[in-house]
Amino acid sequence: MEFDEIKNRLLAYFQEQGKTIAPGDNLFETDVIDSMGVIELVLFTEETLGVELDQAVMTKGNFETLERIAQTIQSASG
Protein backbone atom coordinates (compact mmCIF):
# COMPACT_ATOMS: atom_id res chain seq x y z
CA MET A 1 0.00 0.00 0.00
CA GLU A 2 1.34 3.43 -0.96
CA PHE A 3 2.31 5.93 1.74
CA ASP A 4 0.07 8.71 0.36
CA GLU A 5 -2.92 6.36 0.14
CA ILE A 6 -2.43 5.31 3.76
CA LYS A 7 -2.03 8.92 4.85
CA ASN A 8 -5.20 9.96 3.03
CA ARG A 9 -7.19 7.09 4.55
CA LEU A 10 -5.92 8.09 8.00
CA LEU A 11 -6.86 11.73 7.39
CA ALA A 12 -10.37 10.65 6.40
CA TYR A 13 -10.57 8.45 9.52
CA PHE A 14 -9.71 11.36 11.80
CA GLN A 15 -11.94 13.81 9.90
CA GLU A 16 -14.90 11.45 10.37
CA GLN A 17 -14.26 11.83 14.10
CA GLY A 18 -14.28 15.63 13.78
CA LYS A 19 -10.50 15.93 14.23
CA THR A 20 -8.36 18.40 12.30
CA ILE A 21 -4.71 17.54 11.76
CA ALA A 22 -1.91 19.68 10.39
CA PRO A 23 1.27 18.08 9.00
CA GLY A 24 3.70 17.26 11.79
CA ASP A 25 1.14 17.71 14.59
CA ASN A 26 1.85 15.62 17.67
CA LEU A 27 -1.49 13.83 17.93
CA PHE A 28 -1.14 13.19 21.65
CA GLU A 29 -0.25 16.79 22.52
CA THR A 30 -3.12 18.16 20.40
CA ASP A 31 -5.61 15.70 21.95
CA VAL A 32 -6.38 14.10 18.61
CA ILE A 33 -5.59 10.66 20.01
CA ASP A 34 -5.08 9.00 23.38
CA SER A 35 -4.36 5.43 24.47
CA MET A 36 -7.93 4.31 23.71
CA GLY A 37 -7.71 6.11 20.38
CA VAL A 38 -4.62 4.08 19.51
CA ILE A 39 -6.57 0.87 20.10
CA GLU A 40 -9.42 2.13 17.91
CA LEU A 41 -6.93 3.13 15.22
CA VAL A 42 -5.31 -0.31 15.31
CA LEU A 43 -8.75 -1.89 14.83
CA PHE A 44 -9.42 0.47 11.91
CA THR A 45 -6.07 -0.47 10.40
CA GLU A 46 -6.81 -4.17 10.65
CA GLU A 47 -10.47 -4.05 9.59
CA THR A 48 -10.38 -1.35 6.91
CA LEU A 49 -6.85 -1.44 5.54
CA GLY A 50 -6.30 -5.15 6.07
CA VAL A 51 -2.98 -4.56 7.83
CA GLU A 52 -2.27 -6.28 11.11
CA LEU A 53 0.06 -4.37 13.40
CA ASP A 54 2.41 -6.40 15.57
CA GLN A 55 2.37 -5.54 19.24
CA ALA A 56 6.06 -4.60 19.01
CA VAL A 57 5.26 -1.55 16.83
CA MET A 58 2.55 -0.26 19.15
CA THR A 59 4.68 2.36 20.83
CA LYS A 60 3.76 5.96 21.50
CA GLY A 61 6.46 7.13 19.10
CA ASN A 62 4.86 5.25 16.20
CA PHE A 63 1.54 7.03 16.76
CA GLU A 64 2.66 10.60 17.51
CA THR A 65 2.17 12.04 14.02
CA LEU A 66 0.07 11.19 11.00
CA GLU A 67 3.22 10.63 8.99
CA ARG A 68 4.69 8.24 11.57
CA ILE A 69 1.45 6.25 11.74
CA ALA A 70 1.41 5.97 7.94
CA GLN A 71 5.06 4.80 7.94
CA THR A 72 4.29 2.20 10.60
CA ILE A 73 1.32 0.87 8.64
CA GLN A 74 3.26 0.86 5.37
CA SER A 75 6.10 -1.10 6.97
CA ALA A 76 3.65 -3.61 8.41
CA SER A 77 1.87 -4.05 5.09
CA GLY A 78 5.02 -5.52 3.56
Language model: regions and residue ranges:
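C-terminal structural segments of small proteins and small subunits
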Residues: Q55-K60, L66-A76
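Two-component histidine kinase catalytic core, primarily the HATPase_c
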Residues: G37
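Thiotemplate assembly-line natural product biosynthesis machinery
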Residues: M1-T20, Q71-G78
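Phosphopantetheine carrier-protein modules
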Residues: Q15-V32, V51-T59
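Terminal leader/tail segments of proteins
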Residues: E16, E64-T65
